Structures are given as structure tokens and as C-alpha cells.
Amino acid sequence: MKRLLFFLTVVTLVSCGRSFEKRTAKYAEVGEVSDNRAAVLDINEGVGRWGYVDGTGRLAIECHYADACRFADGMAAVQVPEGAWGYIDTVGRFVIPPQFTLAEPFEDGMAWVQAAGELWGRVDKAGKMVIPCLYSEIGEPDERGWMRVLRDGKWGVLRQDGEVVVPCAYNLIGEPNAYGLIPMTSDGKHGFLGADGREVLPCFFSYISDFKDGYARTNYGGSMV
């Protein structure tokens, strides 16, 4: 009986795979299936529009988007013909209206979005801006969930929930050293931030080495100390 059930399962899967391929053969492009939806590109009279099919290849969301991302967390970023990006659910309803210049798929309930002249921020599934679109660069989070961010040419540090750890006031913020101290630079002077993000050694020095055996060499007032 187990062998028969296994055989029937395999036959069903093969049949479904063939049906999907047959039904989606008419599309110029077919994306990966995620959340039982796959993005498809339909070209009509030279104009391409994206929509979504279900796992069997049947059209689930009409093809009227200028661009479309894969579904994740039950939502997908799509671009309307006018140019703005928003997020739809699996039946094609806008959950977050088109308002962004760029939008990425959701991950763990949040997504990166771009607005206001190529500035990045982060939005949750309810459309709330967890991190406002103020940053030209946002780094990958470290093991603490801290991210280096660039705003108006100055670096700072945020937590993933948007809380400011270090204000955007420095020309450079480096990686923590073995002591957990974070090197930073401001107006050509160097110093260190503590593990909590507060200044422990202000930017007074024209040169400062990394710490070794608890000490660091500095140049202060033209002298090495």
C-alpha cells in the first residue's frame, strides 16, 4: 500500500509539473513559485505586463503591472505603469499603495523600500515605516542587529527596529575591534565608540592605532603617544 501511495504521489507531481509548464508556455518569462504564486510576463503588441499564476499555471492575478517581484510573507512588490511601487496580496489587492521608487520582497515581516530621491528605508506589512526613507546607504546587520547607515554624507548606526544607536555625525564608522570598540572619524580626527555606541574616546587624534594589550598609539598635538 505504501509503494502504491508513493507511486500515485509521484505521478500526481509529474502531472502537475507538466500542466504548469503547458499553461505558462505562452508567457515571455515565468518566475519561481512562492506562496503558490509565480510572476509571469505577458507581451501584447510590444508592451510587456506582469501578473501572477498559481502553482498549476492558471492565471491568478491579471497581467497589468510594469514590473513584479516574487511573493514572500503573502505579499509581493509590484510596479504600476505610472512608475510607483507598492505591495499586493495573493489575490491582487493593494495592501500598501504604490508610493515607492523601488521596493524589495518582504523578509521576516519587513521590506526595504526606496523613496524621496533614492533614499532607503524599511516598511512593515501594515505599511508602517519602521525606518524612514532618509538613508543613501544601509549596511547589513551585524550579530547584534546593528546597521551602519549613511545620511547626508555622514555615517551612523541603527538597530533593525529603526532605533538610533549612533547619530549620523561621522565621516567613517568601522567594524568593532577585539575589545568591542568601534573606530570612527570626524573632520580628519579619529576616536572610538564603546560597545553601547557612546563615545569613549572622542575624535581628538590625527592618528590612532588599534588597541593591543589594552593600549593604542595616538598622534596628539604632533607627538606620538
Regions found by a protein language model. Name each.
Residues F7-L8:
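Sec-dependent N-terminal signal peptides
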Residues R18-V225:
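Residue-level detector of conserved, function-critical positions
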Residues M1-L4:
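Positively charged n-region of N-terminal signal peptides that target proteins for export
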Residues V14-S15:
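C-terminal motif of bacterial Sec signal peptides marking the signal peptidase cleavage site
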